[in-house]
């Protein structure tokens, strides 16, 4: 059954009827006008309702509290977008550098399908992923926008560091998957700073899964989905270099859900990249924003630790670091 339209006055009446105190009506009206009832109320009410099967809010709960949860998550989303953009820029540079060095800067050379793996056909598709990717790259090359038009008409060629500017993060992740082992090692080395001779199968698996998880969080943030409680379906399999050496968690802790997904896991996989700005942008958005929110709603700290999967001691250290 479709829900009928409700104006701002009616929206406020609904919230009052459900036991939510409108403690600052001007703020509430502005928030609902700018961001909408669904984004604020439906997105975050579950944390302050009486119970899972009730639409009534806990006694004493306010719109300001609800709105602060929304603003907190919006700040984290913006931070995740900025952090993952840094990863995208690094990955794009690494792939372009690698294929230019190994295959040359001419389109006819670096777009030669022999240089790549075909990948596996997806369900309901009769084409290999490689040819779908090459179609996208050729479409970019033939686009009538700059800088592609300039390079095509004035140089007769678009080098990879220019062509790849037109790719999305998802395109780049797929491109990486279709590289052959030698080129994958180079990309990992450029992105992480780890010498190629030290790149093991475990590190290759970790890097590939990290890209998929980062892409998942990037998409979630870009589409304004609630993020601090998000659990990506793309999980990190137990991996000694990541879980034991970086995250310092045991196999038992992993089996109990720690280090598989969640913001805590995302923070740690961002730390493997040589581009430290991605980690800084992520950590600042999470710890500063949670610290600011908890100045006004300190009882939410345990909730936010649970939802982000960041343990309380790490959370407090992060808040102290980024709140100075």
Residue map of PLM features:
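Long, contiguous internal "core" modules enriched in hydrophobic/ aromatic residues
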Residues: 1-324
